[in-house]
């Protein structure tokens, strides 16, 4: 049976997050707030860097987003950011654009989950 928890577990690995934070909800809240605050800025900058074909900036921003996604235990977003970083390192604009689209989808899913959770 598919549940909201099982769907959200594929977006953010709550088991890993609880282990990382020893279940401390205050720390988790700080992590969520940090992602909400910094994530959109990184995505806006990343969108411009991809549009301009600025590989060094794409690599740097994908790395930064990967770091905040990893802290949040958003594993699919983390993996997509790593793939984007590698595509930028290879100067492969077609791959960069393709993977950026996946990063954007994963990012939006994380944001929707966090925003929904903050309404509860």
Regions from the language model: what does each represent?
Residues 1-120:
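Two-component system phosphorelay core
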């Amino acid at each position: 049976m598919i549940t909201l928890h099982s769907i959200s577990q594929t977006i953010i690995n709550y088991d890993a997050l609880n282990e990382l934070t020893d279940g401390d909800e205050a720390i988790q809240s700080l992590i969520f707030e940090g992602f909400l605050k910094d994530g959109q800025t990184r995505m806006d900058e990343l969108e411009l860097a991809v549009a301009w074909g600025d590989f060094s900036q794409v690599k740097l921003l994908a790395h930064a987003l990967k770091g905040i996604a990893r802290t949040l235990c958003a594993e699919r977003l983390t993996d997509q950011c790593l793939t984007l970083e590698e595509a930028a390192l290879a100067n492969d604009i077609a791959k960069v654009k393709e993977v950026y689209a996946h990063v954007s989808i994963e990012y939006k899913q994380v944001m929707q989950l966090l925003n929904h959770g903050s309404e509860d």
